[in-house]
């Protein structure tokens, strides 16, 4: 097993304490030239990073993620926001749109079922449908969501409750900055990291999930 940042508990990089950092062979902060990291940031990246840091400090432990999302968008000068959401969270999307508009933002939104394309298009058989008794089911269309919101001139898009994999496609196709308000987790009330808090107790099954599920 290779040693990674996830296995390191020193957080020495936060203090720039090289003495407490792990060996050069495994520590990113030690074995990678700092200039290489800096060169990754173009002018727009620097603006995003700056305003993200300002937003973090200004609302630290006081503002919700929703409030921080609006603060970040405002500081960036974004005024037209897109919402890419799952139809299972239609009510939440409606509230989000209303809150954003109440704060002066223009809002566009696209639900996951936009286009009304049957799942047959991506090779799903009737037996593989969520409801096999139905003649057809409509697929989620994250590529369509992303391209539509991009075409509408959205400056920042907010992902709200897209399924695993569908969020991957959305991010892959979206042409401008994107942030996540919430992931999809039907079991954990859309709080996916709740499973991490229970991984060593009530949800210990996650440690052997692949073996138990796929053999």
Regions inferred by a protein language model and the residue ranges of each:
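Gly/Ser/Thr-rich loops at beta-strand to alpha-helix junctions
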Residues: 59-63, 85-93, 115-116, 160-168
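Long, charge-dense
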Residues: 91-142
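C-terminal functional extensions of proteins
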Residues: 179-215
């Amino acid at each position: 097993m290779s040693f990674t940042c996830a296995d390191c508990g020193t957080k020495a990089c936060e203090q720039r304490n090289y003495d407490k950092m792990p060996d050069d062979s495994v520590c990113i902060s030690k074995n990678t030239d700092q200039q290489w990291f800096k060169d990754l940031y173009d002018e727009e990246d620097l603006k995003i990073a700056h305003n993200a840091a300002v937003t973090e400090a200004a609302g630290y432990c006081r503002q919700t993620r929703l409030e921080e999302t609006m603060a970040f968008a405002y500081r960036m000068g974004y005024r037209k926001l897109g919402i890419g959401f799952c139809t299972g969270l239609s009510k939440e999307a409606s509230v989000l749109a209303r809150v954003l508009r109440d704060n002066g933002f223009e809002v566009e939104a696209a639900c996951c079922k936009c286009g009304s394309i049957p799942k047959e298009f991506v090779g799903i058989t009737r037996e593989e449908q969520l409801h096999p008794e139905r003649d057809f089911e409509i697929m989620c269309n994250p590529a369509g969501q992303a391209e539509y919101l991009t075409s509408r001139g959205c400056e920042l898009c907010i992902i709200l409750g897209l399924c695993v994999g569908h969020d991957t496609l959305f991010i892959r196709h979206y042409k401008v900055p994107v942030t996540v308000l919430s992931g999809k987790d039907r079991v954990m009330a859309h709080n996916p990291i709740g499973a991490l808090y229970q991984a060593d107790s009530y949800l210990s099954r996650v440690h052997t999930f692949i073996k138990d599920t796929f053999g």
